[in-house]
Amino acid sequence: MSEASGRAAGNEMPAKKQKLSSDENSNPELSGDENDDSVSIESGTNTERPDTPTNAANAPGRKGWGKGKWKSKKCKYSFKCVNSLKEDHNQPLFGVQFNWHSKEGDPLVFATVGSNRVTLYECHPQGDIRLLQSYVDADADENFYTCAWTYDSNTSHPLLAVAGSRGIIRIINPITMQCIKHYVGHGNAINELKFHPRDPNLLLSVSKDHALRLWNIQTDTLVAIFGGVEGHRDEVLSADYDLLGEKIMSCGMDHSLKLWRINSLRMKTAIKESYDYNPNKTNRPFVSQKVHFPDFSTRDIHRNYVDCVRWLGDLILSKSCENAIVCWKPGKMEDDIEKIKASESNVTILGRFDYSQCDIWYMRFSMDFWQKMLALGNQVGKLYVWDLEVEDPHKAKCTTLTYPKCASAIRQTSFSRDSSVLIAVCDDSTIWRWDRLR
């Protein structure tokens, strides 16, 4: 982590409730308020996440696949539930993220999203969860699904990107307590946001409109659109950058996982040009790259909606609504990921993390900063934590966390950067704090 990134959360965040509306000096092409309404295509009508189309438990060939290999041993990590609270909107909380761009000794700050609300909290060492700020979107029909933290590379202020059913990305500065810019472009709901691991300005968004978009939030440019001819054929539900930020893996309702390289000459040039672009010095709009062809694609891992994907080194962790997170890699075991061709049809499944009662979609797992732990909640409020510090993924040990009053679907989890706190957010608008026992 660079010094600049470390500074971000150190600025004291004022505590207040804010209305979300954008400031006037955002790029009008991307942020025009007059465009806002054009994006709420069929989104206001159905803000809940519908049921999973088919129950995969009785899919052919599922029962014997990898059975018995994953009897989890006792995990070395243990957690204790120390606090919980409930947000007053009584709607599902779909997303939670700790701000990892903070220095040692800085307060542990996390954000939750659900309904038309974005809320920031601080975890106190004694177990308290303190409300810092709450933002409400001006549109009561907005339903935020996802959030992601970054920092301003000039001021080091923390920044929070949020998006949801209306397909509008909003960037919030918690220090000035303003929505400083917003981006309209996706033709439908946005299901996930991710910031590049090495460039705090490169934001990836994935959407119900079947496409991924890469934005430069410093120059307010749309760098590239991934989708089209060989792109996803249904909603994109999740995506992740690899550790170096050279590759993106995306997944969605079409049961597929697709690899997009962003370290190609074409993409490197596009990213550089997005930094050089200055609308004050030219009349021409920025030309976004249209990437129609992924660098690898497979439908051989899952038999249903793929709703969460993360890189683990050169391996992939992905899940569907089939009660298992699958660890796999493109190509054969010995193949180098950098040399995988788009025509590659092989995949190698290395193992599975099995759990139960998680067959609804849009349930997302998370890892800690050092990728030593993996956490996922199920639809009855049970949390699973796996120890990933094993040479063979088959030997991953699991611990199950339960608390009697936590009985609603856990939509997402997030670890604090030092892994001392695990937060889970639920469908009944509750937030649960688990502290790691050392």
Swiss-Prot record:
Keyword Transcription regulation listed: yes
Residues in WD repeats: 88-131, 139-182, 185-225, 231-270, 301-338, 356-396, 405-438
PROSITE patterns referenced in this protein's UniProt entry, alphabetically: WD_REPEATS_1 (PS00678), WD_REPEATS_2 (PS50082), WD_REPEATS_REGION (PS50294)
Gene3D superfamilies in the record: YVTN repeat-like/Quinoprotein amine dehydrogenase
Domain of life: Eukaryota
Gene Ontology cellular component annotations, sorted alphabetically: ESC/E(Z) complex
Keyword Transcription regulation in record: yes
Oligomeric and partner information: Component of the prc2/eed-ezh2 complex. Can interact with ezh2, hdac1 and taf9. Interacts with yy1.
Membership in a protein family: Belongs to the WD repeat ESC family.
Annotated function: Polycomb group (PcG) protein. Component of the prc2/eed-ezh2 complex, which methylates 'Lys-9' and 'Lys-27' of histone H3, leading to transcriptional repression of the affected target gene. May play a role in neural induction.
Name of the protein in its database record: Polycomb protein eed-B
Organism in which the protein naturally occurs: Xenopus laevis (African clawed frog)
Gene: eed-b
